[in-house]
């Protein structure tokens, strides 16, 4: 018998602001087998979880994610545009999301957002963080950029 997995796209994004900690926690609480999330780099090279290259659609900020440090990104509200109820939600770091899922068997699909903007070193940083939390057996890495996946595979080989 095959086991079909329920992966919550950007967390429980139908009911909560996408790619936020509350959306990820609710996906876990609601019985999802895993989540899909999107990763980009901030100006100070922090791995941040946000789908769009710009802040405009999902936050009260404007401009490109890459043009802000993580501390600056924390000033933007990632929940209010979804609903006033979620005012105050922040753009999370990938590390904070991984910490949430270390002590369970949740599956993570990490999409490398490296096609419109080329974030040099994104793949290596993501792999090292996955390895730090011993999540190699529970992570799927995806990207629309086939070269990004190739680089990720090469990073894995250099560590093994």
Report residues per predicted region.
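Phosphate-group recognition and catalysis centered on beta-loop-alpha active-site segments
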Residues: 1-160
